[in-house]
Swiss-Prot record:
Oxidative deamination of D-amino acids. It comes from the Bacteria. This is D-amino acid dehydrogenase. Pathway: Amino-acid degradation; D-alanine degradation; NH(3) and pyruvate from D-alanine: step 1/1. It is an enzyme of class 1 (oxidoreductase). It comes from Citrobacter koseri (strain ATCC BAA-895 / CDC 4225-83 / SGSC4696). Signal peptide: none annotated.
């Protein structure tokens, strides 16, 4: 089957890889000159299934009001003048209760755990290198309340069979030796030993090279104007004077998916702006070994080979990519507070990206009401964590195979009353 994938971020490229491996003729289209040059370029570097959790959580509405008056707040909201933003925020608020939180987190952890397994299998079969580490993730608590609240997340981890360690502050240095100097500032931590880290951009670029060698066609510097459709079928992608035709089309444009699908399929994917610093390592014994997640500031500090990536925060501000100095100061403050000898902060590279977020935090994956239009978007802050699993899942559904995990609750059907996703079926031209 001929498949066109719109988007060459980590989700688009992993989709291309798995579809190609399933025997399909795949073309990837992107406006950028190469893969992973937007949201996948400089994210926090975490592959953290156990910490897969929606921003829509109990207590967030009240916290959001408090954060409005804090200099280093993890979340900020500025109205962008669109009804879509207001509707999206209302839908998010409706997910901020315990029942929705547990349901959403459960399916996010399910997909993320599967995705990590897919990444391991891909690494074993291809030998792909991306400055990855398998040292786990350590979530740090600065208050007694945060430490106590961890029991709620532990219940979800236990249900999903995810191993964990709840550590008192005196034991944090056993996992991250450099924290010995600052343990007095912390109340404890939650460690997930099976989590991983890695450079998402490097991974995506190298996988794109492998995919191209395997037969995938990449059309870069190719802006997409619109999808062409008739009845319940997409019949082409208009790119300037060209119309690119295929048997199936996959939307993986991240935050730009919503606008591209306007009038075709309604999906609640909104840009969640985040920031990062990439810092050269100064003293190896003063830098993190793997990934740290600061629960107070919602900031991750991740170790690559000779670099430290500090990323986080969320701004609901529309398609604004301005680099704000106060956000840089927050990132610098957190990394200096936890790892004062770790990096040359003054040499850091400052970056921002737009994560494609749904109100419930879960991506939308699968077929739409158009029989040959598929979605793989809306992964929010977890695109790197969920990419391989999402790509394999999409490939299985599109190819008519039964996926390894349940997936009905990942469909756009949860936002489209009356639409029921079809079960896997053997499509004309699919290779199995």
């Amino acid at each position: 089957m001929r498949v066109v994938i719109l988007g060459s971020g980590v989700v688009g490229v992993t989709s291309a890889w798995y579809l190609c491996q399933a025997g399909h003729d795949v073309t990837v289209i992107d406006r950028e000159p190469g893969p992973a040059l937007e949201t996948s370029a400089a994210n926090a570097g975490q592959i953290s299934p156990g910490y897969a959790a929606p921003w829509a959580a109990p207590g967030v509405p009240l916290k959001a009001i408090k954060w409005m008056f804090q200099r280093h707040a993890p979340l900020a909201v500025r109205l962008d003048g669109t009804q879509f933003q207001l509707k999206w925020m209302w839908q998010m608020l409706r997910n901020c209760d315990t029942r929705h939180y547990m349901e959403n987190k459960g399916r996010m952890v399910r997909l993320a755990e599967y995705s990590r397994d897919c990444l391991k299998a891909l690494r074993a079969s291809t030998g792909i290198q991306y400055e990855g580490r398998q040292g786990g993730t350590l979530q740090l608590f600065r208050t007694a309340q945060q430490y106590e609240n961890a029991t709620r997340d532990i219940a979800v981890l236990e249900d999903a069979g995810v191993p964990y360690q709840l550590l008192e502050s005196s034991r944090l240095a056993e996992v991250e030796p450099a924290l010995a100097e600052v343990a007095h500032k912390l109340t404890g931590g939650l460690r997930l030993p099976n989590d991983e880290t890695g450079d998402c951009q490097l991974f995506t670029q190298r996988l794109a090279q492998m995919a191209e060698q395997a037969g995938v066609t990449f059309r870069f510097n190719t802006p997409v104007e619109k999808l062409l459709y008739e009845g319940e079928q997409i019949y082409g992608v208009k790119c300037g004077d060209d119309i690119i035709k295929a048997d199936a089309y996959v939307m993986a444009f991240g935050s730009y998916s919503t606008a591209m699908l306007k009038g075709i399929v309604d999906i609640p994917v909104y840009p969640l702006k985040g920031y990062s610093l990439t810092i050269p390592v100064a003293q190896d014994d003063g830098a993190p070994v793997s990934t740290i997640l600061d629960e107070t500031y919602k900031i991750a500090i991740t170790r690559f080979d000779k670099r430290i990536r500090v990323g986080g925060m969320a701004e609901i501000v529309g398609f604004n990519t301005e680099l704000l100095q106060p956000r840089r100061e927050t990132l610098e403050m957190v990394v200096r507070d936890l790892f004062p000898r770790g990096g040359h902060v003054e040499q850091a590279t400052f970056w921002t990206g737009l994560r494609p977020m749904t109100p419930d935090g879960t991506p939308v994956i699968g077929r739409t009401r158009f029989k040959n239009l598929w979605l793989n978007t809306g992964h929010g802050t977890l695109g790197w964590t969920m990419a391989c699993g999402s790509g394999q899942l999409l490939s299985d559904i599109l190819s008519g195979r039964t996926p390894a995990i349940p997936y009905d609750d990942l469909s756009v059907a949860r936002y489209s009353p009356g639409f029921t996703p079809s079960r896997p079926r053997h499509l004309h031209g699919a290779h199995n």
